[in-house]
């Protein structure tokens, strides 16, 4: 099949049909046919492949783990990771610690922040229940990618405390404060017990619950 593809390398339209009929990947199986199209589909896919080689997907899946608890977090890439990461700070801006009046706080609140949609109950037997979510966002800066989301997490580990610790490790790694959904108290109590409640932002008044 590879030889067949090579024989059509100078004919993008025919190559596209060969790829569609004998795909190597799921994406290839769902390619559009050249029939009835006003555009040169073969050339379009050829350009897409070229662009992907020039600019590979910047998002990496993986998990944050403690290399040394409460001292250093590392990121471990894995295809089934719970985190999707598009950007990381330079090594000297990772795992930075800060104290205010003896309390651990996020050192880089001016660089970015995170939003958390948590849950309080462990996974049910039938697997129902919404996922926990975390997004980390870079604020405007001239020194790093700005005004963009850099981390996405949408998963529901069997134990809620695994989710809480995932969120804590990510916040520790980036040094960003977190805004937690106001009716979820489990994660707040967890951060307090771990000594990291200084990483939690006060909820803006205009987002408070109506009385």
Model-based region annotation:
Residues 1-203:
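RNase H-like, metal-dependent nuclease domains and their acidic two-metal-ion catalytic environment used
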Residues 209-211:
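Conserved RecA-like P-loop NTPase helicase motor core
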Residues 205-207:
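Small/flexible residues
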